[in-house]
Amino acid sequence: MQERHSDRERYFDEQARTTEKYYIPYIRKCCPELPQEVLEVGCGEGGNLFSFAQLGCSVTGVDIAAGRIAEARKFFAERGAEGTFIASDIFKLTELEHKFSLILVHDVTEHIDDKAGFLKGLKRYLAPGGVVFIAFPAWQMPFGGHQQIAHSKVVSHFPFLHLLPSPLYKGVLAAAGENEPTIRELMNIKHTRCPIEKFQAALYSTGYRVVDRQLYFINPHYETKFGLKPRKLYGSLSVLPYVRNFFSTSCFYLVQPERG
């Protein structure tokens, strides 16, 4: 497992820096006046929300992992920031419906099996005119299987390993000494994978329009993590179906429900 995935406070701070430098400027492309009510679904420790809170936004984070929510509350309190954090399935929180001008969904979509159902459900939490910022790694990119969470140094640093056929991939994970929960999580990600084409099909089938899209050859978050300068994916590579997935380490979307 790469160190930042075990040091959650470091992970929080890295997320906050990337959000301030890249996510917020991207969102401001369509929302020059930053929305005041911000929800993050799958917020983890809350690092993405911290920079919004620093700008005076009212932030709410929801995650099914109670441990992550406890860490979010702790990290916010230690930094004197205000935020509401709830350990729950978002779709059980009817009191939050129609409240948020901005919803963040960062590195979550690739973990969800019913992507269309998830996207459709998100609409209930948007205020009129609200937007959703969605970011995810394309499945076929070098670490699209999240193998960096593995405990084995070989597995966690091995690009494209997740593209092996399922029985072989599972066998390699077991041979590398991964425990059952880690194997189960990595195999589940393989099942719920998110190629660009699959995501866009779910998006259009649930009545969203794309306000903006940017594919990245080098994920902006890699600057914080590895010191690599972000690189956008341009030209034919960005529009070639399937092929672009191998080169898109992060896919940014700003979307809204269709009017009418």
Enumerate the language-model features and the residues they cover:
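Short glycine-/acidic-enriched loop or helix-start segments at secondary-structure transitions
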Residues: 49-50, 71, 114-115, 143-145
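A short His-aromatic
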Residues: 107-111
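Conserved N-terminal segment of class I S-adenosyl-L-methionine
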Residues: 1-98, 102, 106, 246-253, ...
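Helix-to-beta-strand junctions that scaffold the AdoMet/dcAdoMet cofactor pocket
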Residues: 112-113, 126-127
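Conserved strand-to-helix beginnings and helix N-cap segments that scaffold or border functional pockets
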Residues: 97, 115-116
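A generic structural signal for alpha->beta connector loops
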Residues: 56, 82, 129, 207-210
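S-adenosyl-L-methionine-dependent methyltransferase catalytic module, highlighting the catalytic core
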Residues: 116-121, 131-256
